[in-house]
UniProtKB/Swiss-Prot annotation:
SUPFAM superfamilies: Anticodon-binding domain of a subclass of class I aminoacyl-tRNA synthetases, Nucleotidylyl transferase, ValRS/IleRS/LeuRS editing domain
Signal peptide residues on this chain, from the entry's feature table: none
Cofactor: Zn(2+)
Origin species: Streptococcus thermophilus (strain ATCC BAA-250 / LMG 18311)
Name of the molecule in the record: Isoleucine--tRNA ligase
Binding site for L-isoleucyl-5'-AMP: E554
Record's cofactor remark: Binds 1 zinc ion per subunit.
Length: 929
């Protein structure tokens, strides 16, 4: 036998190298076969419910790192709730209708207009479901625990029927109406868009300053006067029917030198406009308030058959332009509102593909709207005063990345204005985890217009509206419920397979159809109405979930998207918000803080991370950043996270190895019988348990990460485990001192493994497989530990916190001695302490081997004068010398009692007593040399 074999060196086959890319799929397969998710739900039956409702990602393409961050975050929350006494099933979902899938099929050569509608929709459906299957595997590979066999998908018959019923309730309450209001129109998608489908980019546009000649000045202005207007959309001049001024804005009538014409502009803008138009010696002839100009008639710049009326509008400002806005009610929301209020004609001169129509005039017809500025300038002639190229923020179609226009077309709307206050009141009742999120959603609802819910596309849920022979829309409770039942049985494709009459209840009649003939709506619903109905299609309809949901968690872009549409439909139907709490996340940026894009080549695919590091590292990264804001990710950042993971893993490996001969049933020591330092570590660990439990409760992942890493690196590795080796390795295997420390080790190991499970389920499960005395076969089926309180813990903490301050000073003294070559490592030191009365009392009260705690070979507490050479601190001073004696071959301490023993071992008296007591045969025969 060798001397080394008398040490209690930890034994474990738990590997230092995690091998996550290979091991994770093995664990996931085992969990699936063992039905761990289902067993967790069964265990929690009858407990309080917690419903985190999954916002559905769009079923197209592989998941990106933003998807991964979001789904991992949800998984951490749901797992922590499941392990905290809540019944928390998680139903993943997918959004499956909409233009992107139509675009994919178009790129594959599918020509929608040449196919039967039902055949085309089947192709869309098949593609969408293939993407659901692909993404499901992507999410499962992240270790997300969910009801993967029973997800919700917005194209299933039950979901479509639930969506129709949401629409039906809104129709019954009078919230659905048809109008020809201007809407965001995407010529590239040939469809109306909702606000959530708009993104803003900088765009360079041609802006024109031109003048309308006064035709009837109403006794205020002469007919040789011209009203100057500004436009950034020259094509809309073809549909201009009025000029809008601000009632309280001051306008001036001016005559520049050398001009026969007089002009009206806003007084505040005269100087800048004079410079722009090269006007000199401008004479101000008169001033007017805007309301004095109301109802003056001007000529259209080139269309002699059109008059343009001066009207008042609150949207007019003097921030830019001329203080007068040309008004085309067919091409803008403000224009429409003031135009209709003043009886202006609503004219639309651009078709669905962005092409100018015949009513724009022969010079414009057939041309693309964005290419007609030169023609407009030519038509204006000397009415054109200036032209500028301006860069401004402009709305784009978020899918095609092309600019959009406002365009008035017949559309179906949800009247948000009718119940806006009810929505705002509900927002006040929601718990937001960021105050700015509440303000953002509140302001969006407060300021938004009515919701255009119709789309001129194919792949989506039909609007369940019929028309009588006289074109009266029909959407009664009876007809809508009948359609819902048909969709429930056959899916929404039946809308396209049957005639209108066959979709109506048998024997249905309507006074507007004396001949019994009916037609049906060809538009589909906005996809935001699809996902915005999920609270009904899923949360209400699934018995295992509770409505309203406890939590919605998505990216911050969903304030204008899913958070918004879900809120509107839920309040419209039931008068309540669909969520009790709202939590939003920022975007994942690259390592430099730049937005990720394929064109820049700076994207990170979750699959690449899984292959190089493992999903655990991606999961740990999610907790290491503040996801409420934009976060950075790169392979370098993930390498740093991987290093944190390695420290966590190896610390827990040390605990596994050094409790391999510990049976908690027979070997554990009661708290009151632990040494003071072991009690201190137990209390500190329970403080960690409380902090982590609180952080899980408040979804504060970063707090968990920081608390955990700090405890492992500072409290455990740098302190407790550092000196623990002198006990667990050196002392007799069954000694009280060793069992005391093992009790603390085992307690920390078991509980920290449970605390880690929501974040690192694969690693936690691997550790759990080495804990033979724990009852649950999977750690996921256990409960998170509760923090314990102990008698006199405050006094104990105060004492040991004071010691930790003292220890820091001692370490500085040892470091100085190292720098001066007095010692090499601390175990070579004899540390002499010169304490004041308070520190002396502290050290004596610890009742612990101070040399062991400070990892020195010898320690003296001295009285009397402090030597000049001492390292001085407030309340204590130190001197450091090399310890006397020889190095013990067993404990490595320098000890005066170290000598060669008769059994071939050069060891100290303490080690000799352990060997002679526990290894009698070796003492008789001698150690191998």
């Amino acid at each position: 036998m060798k001397l080394k074999e008398t040490l209690n060196l930890g034994k474990t086959s738990f590997p230092m190298r995690a091998g996550l890319p290979n091991k994770e799929p093995i664990w996931q397969k085992e969990w699936e076969e063992a039905k761990v998710y289902q067993r967790r739900q069964e265990l929690n039956q009858g407990k309080p419910h917690f419903t985190l409702h999954d916002g559905p990602p769009y079923a197209n393409g592989n998941i990106h790192v933003g998807h991964a961050m979001n789904k991992i975050s949800k998984d951490i929350i749901v797992r922590s709730k499941s392990m905290s006494g809540f019944y928390a099933p998680f139903i993943p979902g997918w959004d499956t209708h909409g233009l992107p899938i139509e675009q994919v099929l178009a790129k594959q050569g599918v020509k929608r207009k040449e196919l039967d509608r039902a055949e085309y929709l089947k192709m869309c459906r098949d593609y969408a479901l293939s993407q659901v299957d692909k993404q499901r595997e992507d999410f499962k590979r992240l270790g997300v625990s969910a009801d993967w066999e029973n997800p919700y998908v917005t194209l299933t018959p039950d979901y479509e029927a639930a969506q129709i019923r949401v629409f039906g309730e809104m129709a019954k309450k009078g919230y659905i109406y048809q109008g020809a209001k201007p809407v965001y129109w995407s010529w590239s998608s040939e469809s109306a868009l909702a606000e959530a489908e708009i993104e803003y980019h900088d765009l360079v546009s041609t802006s024109l300053y031109y003048a309308n000649k006064v035709k009837d000045g109403k006794g205020v202005l002469d007919t040789d006067t011209y009203i100057v207007v500004w436009t950034t959309t020259p094509f809309t001049v073809t549909a201009s029917r009025g000029l809008t001024v601000g009632a309280d804005i001051e306008y001036v009538l001016v005559k520049p030198a050398g001009e026969t014409r007089k002009f009206i502009v806003a007084s505040e803008l005269l100087n800048s406009l004079s410079e722009k138009f090269a006007w000199e010696e401008v004479e101000v002839l008169n001033t007017y308030r805007g309301d004095e100009l109301n109802q003056i008639v001007t000529e259209h710049p080139w269309d002699s058959e059109v008059d343009e009326l001066v009207i008042l509008g609150e949207h007019v400002t003097t921030d830019s332009g001329t203080g007068i806005v040309h008004t085309a009610p067919g091409f803008g929301e403000d224009d429409y509102n003031v135009g209709v209020a003043n009886g202006l004609e609503v004219v639309v001169t651009v078709n669905e593909r962005g092409i100018m129509m015949e009513n724009a005039g022969p010079d414009f017809a057939g041309k693309f709207y964005d290419k007609v500025a030169p023609i407009v300038m030519e038509k204006l002639g000397d009415l054109l005063l200036a032209k500028e190229e301006i860069s401004h923020s402009y709305p784009f179609d978020w899918r095609t990345k092309k600019p959009i226009i406002w365009r008035a077309v017949p559309q179906w709307f949800a009247s948000v204005s009718k119940f806006r206050q009810e929505i705002l009141d509900e927002i006040e009742k929601v718990k937001f985890h960021s105050e700015w999120g509440k303000v953002r959603l509140y302001n969006m609802i407060r300021d938004r217009g009515d919701w255009v819910i119709s789309r001129q596309r194919a792949w989506g849920v039909p609007l369940p509206i019929f028309y009588a022979e006289d074109r009266t829309p029909i959407m009664t409770e009876e007809t809508i419920e009948h359609v819902a039942k048909l969709f429930e049985e056959h899916g929404s494709v039946i809308w396209w397979e049957r005639d209108a009459k066959d979709l109506l209840p048998e024997g249905f009649t309507h006074p507007g159809s004396p001949n019994g003939e009916f037609t049906k709506e060809n538009d589909i619903m906005d996809v935001w109405f699809d996902s915005g109905s999920s609270w009904n299609g899923v949360v209400v309809n699934r018995p295992e979930l509770t409505y309203p949901a406890d939590l919605y968690l998505e990216g911050s872009d969903q304030y204008r998207g899913w958070f918004n549409s879900s809120l509107i439909t839920s309040v419209a139907n039931h008068g309540v918000a669909p969520y009790k709490q709202l939590l939003s996340q920022g975007f994942a940026l690259d390592g430099k803080g730049e937005k990720m894009s394929k064109s820049l080549g700076n994207t990170i695919a979750p699959s690449d991370v899984e292959k190089q590091f493992g999903a655990e590292i991606l999961r740990l990264w999610v907790t290491s950043v503040d996801t409420s804001n934009d976060v950075r990710i790169s392979m370098d950042i993930l390498s740093q996270v991987s290093e944190s993971y390695r420290k966590i893993r190896n610390t827990l490996r040390f605990l596994i190895a050094n409790t391999s001969d510990f049976n908690p049933t027979t070997d554990a020591v009661a708290f009151e019988d632990l040494r003071s330092v072991d009690q201190y570590m137990t209390i500190r660990f329970n403080q960690l348990v409380k902090n982590i439990r609180d952080a899980y409760e408040n979804f504060e992942f970063l707090t968990i990460y920081k608390s955990l890493v700090n405890f492992i690196n500072v409290e455990l590795s740098a302190f407790y485990l550092d000196f623990a080796k002198d006990v667990v390795y050196i002392e007799s295997a069954k000694s009280l001192e060793r069992r005391q420390m093992q009790t603390v080790f085992y307690d920390i190991l078991v509980k920290i493994t449970k605390l880690l499970t929501p974040i690192l389920p694969h690693t936690a499960e691997e550790i759990w497989s080495y804990l033979e005395f724990e009852n649950e076969d999977y750690v996921q089926l256990s409960e998170l530990p509760e923090a314990e309180d102990f008698a006199n813990q405050d006094a104990l903490l105060e004492k040991w916190n004071a010691f930790m301050d003292f220890r820091g000073k001692a370490q500085k003294a040892l470091e100085e001695a190292r720098n001066e070559k007095v010692i090499g490592k601390s175990l070579e030191a004899h540390l002499t302490i010169y304490p004041d009365a308070e520190v002396k009392e502290l050290l004596e009260s610890l009742n612990t081997n101070l040399a062991q705690l400070l990892i020195v070979s010898a320690l003296t507490i001295a009285e009397g004068d402090v030597p000049e050479s001492a390292v001085r601190f407030q309340g204590v001073s130190f001197t450091v010398e090399r310890a006397e004696g020889e190095v013990c071959d067993r404990c490595r301490r320098i000890d005066p009692t170290t000598k060669e023993r008769s059994y071939n071992a050069t060891i100290c008296n303490h080690c000799a007593s352990i060997i002679e007591e526990n290894f009698a045969e070796v003492v008789a025969e001698g150690f191998e040399v």
